[in-house]
Structures are given as structure tokens and as C-alpha cells.
Amino acid sequence: LAMIVDDVLHIVNSYCSNRRSDGMVTIEKFYKNGLYNPNYDDDLKRYKDIVMMLSDLVFEQTRLLNLILKRMRSYMPDYQIEAGKLMTDSVVEHNEYREDEETSSPYPGLKEYMIVRSTRNYHIGSGMIEI
């Protein structure tokens, strides 16, 4: 769990800004760097890739936390039973690993995750991106 949290924080610290008046953190729209950006198309693609990667990492965190709850409940059946299963706001289904993914360490780290995320039961991005 610490590894995935560290990877999310790395991306957030690299690309996010909290300049909003409501205190929310947003991804900096670096493709809008002034009046004219000769790299606009490439920068926009990179921005979208980062947004999709962060979203996929949130889905992965949800799967991992549900796996932890499942394993805890195998020893203590009533553990956090009132919490049920964890979900993200945008995806109600597909918030668990498939049986073949339930290894001792299902999150393989950021670089490897970029390769395997398209095999997960739900993802919005795929492939390697530059972080």
C-alpha cells in the first residue's frame, strides 16, 4: 500500500497545484502555457495521460484496500463489516482484483503497473507514460 501511495504522491507533487480558491488540488494545465504553445498537441496528450494514470492509480488503490479488507475478514469475519466494500465515486463495479491477481503484492510498482494496467478489470488509460 505504501508503494502505491508513494507513486500517487510523486505524481501529485510533480503536476498538481492547489491554487484554487476552494483549496482543492488540481492538475496543472501545463499545455496552456501562454498565448501560443508550439508543443500544444504533445503537451495536451501528456496532460491527458497523467490524468488517466492518476485515475487508474486510484482504482488500483481501491482494489488493494478491498483486498486488505478481504484478507483481514478471513481472520476476523466482522472486521469493518459495516464499511462493506470500498468504491470510487465514478466506478461502482470493478473495485476488486480478479482471483489470479490476488498475489502477496498485486501492485507491482509504477513502471510495471503502466504495462499491466490495461489487463485490470477497469482502467481508463494504457501504456507507458513519461512522469
State where each predicted segment sits.
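Long, low-complexity or tandemly repetitive, helically biased scaffold regions used
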Residues: 2-131
